Structure formats: C-alpha cells, structure tokens
Regions:
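N-terminal export signals
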Residues: 2, 8-27
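Beta-alpha junction/loop-to-helix N-cap segments that form part of ligand/metal-binding clefts
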Residues: 28-32, 60-61, 71, 75-143, ...
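Extracytoplasmic "Venus flytrap"
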Residues: 36-38, 45-64, 68, 86-92, ...
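Short, solvent-exposed amphipathic alpha-helices that sit
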Residues: 57-72, 94, 133, 159-162, ...
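Periplasmic-binding protein-like
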Residues: 102-114, 134-136, 178-181, 235-245, ...
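Extracellular/periplasmic Venus flytrap/periplasmic-binding protein
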Residues: 141-142, 149-259, 295-304
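Extracellular/periplasmic periplasmic-binding protein-like sensory domains
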Residues: 252-325, 338, 389, 393-399
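Segments of small-molecule ligand-sensing domains
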Residues: 311-321, 332-387
C-alpha cells in the first residue's frame, strides 16, 4: 500500500470512528453520575386481565401505569417506553402463559398481575428468569423469600390487620362479630389478618367463619343466600366481610334485602371502583373500610394524580390505579439508577436503591420483603352530592 493509500485509509477509519462515537453519544446524554437520557426504548411487560372477571382491575392497572407515562413524556429513567400488554385472563395457567410470552419478547421488567392465584403460579418462572416483576396488585401472604418480585400494592392480610384493632374497640364485651369471605387465596388472607390482629382467642370472633363459594364473574342472585341466612340467624353486633367488584355488589344488595342493619366493616375493595355506582344509598351508606389509599387524601402527589386521572377517565381513581402508577415511578427511578447497564439483573439491583416513593397514597418505601411500608386509612361510605363516595376518616396504622 502506498503512503497516499495509507493516509486515505486512516482518514476513512478516523471518520468511521468519529461517526460511531457520535452515534453512541447521541444515544446517551447525561452527567457523570450515571443518569443518562437515551433514545433507546426500554421494553416493559404489563400483565393485566383483559378478559374474564378480573378485567375491571386489569383496566385500572393499565390506566395507572399509562397515566404516569403521560405525565412524564412517555419515558422511564430517560428512555422512551415500549409497553407490551399481555392478557392475564383469570386462571393461573393463562397468567403464567402471559408472563412466559413477555419474557420471551425480551422485556427488561414486568409489572401488573391482578390475581393472587396467578402470582403464586408465576413465582418460580419469574425467579428463574431473573426478570424483575413489580407487581401492582396480587400479593398473597404466602409469597415470601423472593428476590425478583417486588410489590407496590400491599400484602393481602394487611387490610384486615389494620382494621381489626378499630373494630375491637367498638364491639362491646360479650358482643359478636360475624366473618364472611369467599374460599380462595385472597379471602383466606383477609380473614387470617383480621383474626390475628383482633386476637384469635377473643370470644367476640369465636364463631366459625362463614365461607362462601368463590365465583368467577358475576354471582347469581342466590349465590350468597346460605351465607346471609347464617349471618341473620347469628344476630351479630357487627359484620366483617371480604368481597370486591360484582361479588361485592350482589352480596351487599342481598344482605340489605335480608334486613341486616348492623355495622359493616371490610377491606376497602368492598366499595372500591365502580361498586358504589351500582348500589343505593340505603345499601351502602355507613360502611367502614380500611385501605392504603383514599381519593380525597390531601397531598401534592395525590392532587396531581387524582386530577389527571379524573380528566383522563371521568372517574374516581382507585387503589389499583395508584399501585400501578407507583410501579411506573419505581421503574422510572430504578432504570435511572441502573445507568447504562439495563440488563434485568442490574435493574433488579437498582430497584433496591430507589428509596422513598412520593405516592398519591403518601410517601412509602420498600421493606426487606420487597413490599411497601405504608399507612392504612379508615374510610366511610357517605353521600357526596348525588353520589356515594369513600370519605377519609382517619389513619389506622402503618404496616410493612
């Protein structure tokens, strides 16, 4: 090669090198602390029920996550987001198939998951894949010793644990509390948490739990007839129950028809979402519930979130939407902390450093089991103009 040829070749190689460096720099713009802004999209897998009985909750999970993206330029950690939604369905098998499909698509993280039964079924799949899952709803109490599963919602027994001391203070000595719930994972946890916190040896909850058959979809008119007959025959001073969605609507209507007028206590899912829209004032007014969120919480994060949610969807935000909104915030912080190494393994390590989350429910942070340490609130169903609303009464406890 002549001297001229060598010079020309060096100029070409130099130009190519500069072009490559420029291209790399155009993808990563940030400071020396490792907080890049990138045009490289990050793919997130959303597992949410889009069919079956859990679809209303699945819709709320999608709305909450998408709202965070809408308020943050469609980016997480400086990256544009490709959100891939897979239908969880309503069975463990359908949920597991959704998770496996998303992992095969190369997502850097998973989020969502409505059903506790699905969560139990996908535990090993997630742990073995080492793709972090930031679950925004399902949270069975039996889910322990996990490395790659984080939860932004709660543990299923916590609503009952938070509420029980309040109920215990208000039921007189010699009184009785009837307990009723469907016979599936979340129902078992809701009852166990309440009984443990109330005091399992307390005579006021000594009567056997009234278990109902778990029904997928809308229950029939007589689905809860036997349970309600048992409640009425016991003549309790108060009722603690666990239902949600269509099951809550049917149960409360039939209970009112049967003539039950004592105080009803429940985890907040009993009156969350569209439940109150389907009930008369006489069927729901005065119900007391415990939940980690109330739409009327007075803090800056909730004012922003609730206003944007109502504007986007014309409805009151729910705890389901908040947990998913927070899952997006967790990923936003985690991806930024992960810096240039956005492998699932490095992202999972970064999630352990996200610190306090400025949530609409109030500030919270992950505890050692990877669930929120957070406040729980007492709410009462009251008239708000022409509609029924869950109105914040007080704080109950901080759990986690």
């Amino acid at each position: 090669m002549s001297q001229m040829d060598r010079r020309q070749a060096l100029r070409v190689l130099g130009a190519l090198g500069a072009t490559g460096l420029t291209a790399a720099c155009s993808r990563w713009v940030g400071d020396d602390a490792g907080e890049p802004s990138s045009d490289e999209p990050v793919r997130i897998g959303m597992v949410a029920a889009q069919s079956g009985a859990f679809k209303p909750i699945g819709d709320e999970l999608i709305r909450g996550f998408q709202l965070y993206l809408d308020l943050n330029d469609q980016r997480l950690g400086g990256h544009p987001v490709e959100l891939v939604v897979a239908d969880e369905g309503e069975t463990p098998d359908s949920g597991k198939a959704a998770v496996e499909g998303l992992i095969k698509q190369g997502v850097v993280a998973l989020t969502g998951v409505v059903s506790s039964a699905v969560m139990s079924a996908i535990r090993d799949t997630v742990e073995q894949s080492k793709v972090p899952l930031i679950s925004s709803n399902a949270s069975p109490a039996t889910l322990q010793s996990v490395v790659y599963i984080w939860r932004t919602s709660y543990v299923n027994d916590e609503a009952g644990r938070a509420l029980a001391p309040y109920v215990a203070q208000r039921v007189p000595a010699g009184g009785r509390v009837a307990i009723v719930a469907p016979d599936y994972d979340a129902g078992f946890d809701a009852v166990q948490g309440f009984r443990q916190s109330f005091g399992e040896s307390d005579d006021r909850i000594a009567d056997p739990v009234i278990w109902t058959r778990y029904v997928k979809g809308k229950p029939g008119r007589n689905t809860y007839a036997a349970a309600i007959n048992e409640i009425m025959s016991r003549k309790p001073d108060a009722l603690y129950c666990f239902f949600s969605g269509e099951a809550a609507v049917v149960f409360l209507k039939r209970l009112h028809e049967a003539g039950f007028r004592k105080q009803i206590y429940a985890p907040g899912f009993l009156t969350e979402g569209t439940v109150l829209e389907q009930l008369k004032v006489s069927e729901a007014e005065g119900i007391l519930t415990s939940l980690n969120y109330s739409a009327d919480l007075n803090n800056a994060a909730n004012r922003r979130f609730a206003s944007a949610f109502r504007k986007a969807h014309g409805s009151t935000p729910t705890t389901y939407a908040v947990a998913s909104y927070d899952a997006a915030q967790v990923l936003d912080k985690g991806i930024r902390l992960a810096g240039r190494d956005l492998s699932p393994l490095n992202l999972n390590l970064a999630l352990g450093r996200v610190g306090q989350i400025d949530s609409p429910r109030g500030p919270w942070q992950f505890n050692q089991p990877r669930t929120p340490q957070q406040k729980w609130y007492l709410r009462r169903v009251q008239r708000d103009g022409q509609v029924l609303s869950n109105v914040l009464i007080s704080e109950l406890a901080t759990l986690g």
